[in-house]
Amino acid sequence: LSMTMTFAENEELNTTNTANAYKMTVNYSRLADALCLSIDQLEAVQDIHSEFCADMMNAGNANADERKPMVEKALQKDLKHMRYVLTENQYRKYLMLLNVTISNRGLEK
C-alpha cells in the first residue's frame, strides 16, 4: 500500500511540475522596463501575452504527445504578434528573454 501511495504522490508531483513549467505569467512592469515599452505597447503586449499564457497552459494540460506541437504553435503565434508590436531592438530582447525562459523550464524546441 505504501508503494502505491508513493507512486501516486510522485505522479501528482510530476503533474504539478509539468503544469508549472507551462505557466508563463510575467511581471509586466519589469518586462516594460526591460523592453522600454510605451503605454500603448504595454497594453498590446499584455493582451498578446495573456493569449500566449492560455495557449501554453492548454499545452501543459494536453497529452504528452500533443504538447510539443502545441508549444510550437503558441510560440510562433506569440512571436508573430510581438514582432508587429515591438521595435526590432525590443523584439530581439524579447526573443532572448523568451528563449531563456523556455530553456530554463525544459521546454526547448
Regions found by a protein language model. Name each.
Residues 7-109:
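Charge-rich (acidic/polar
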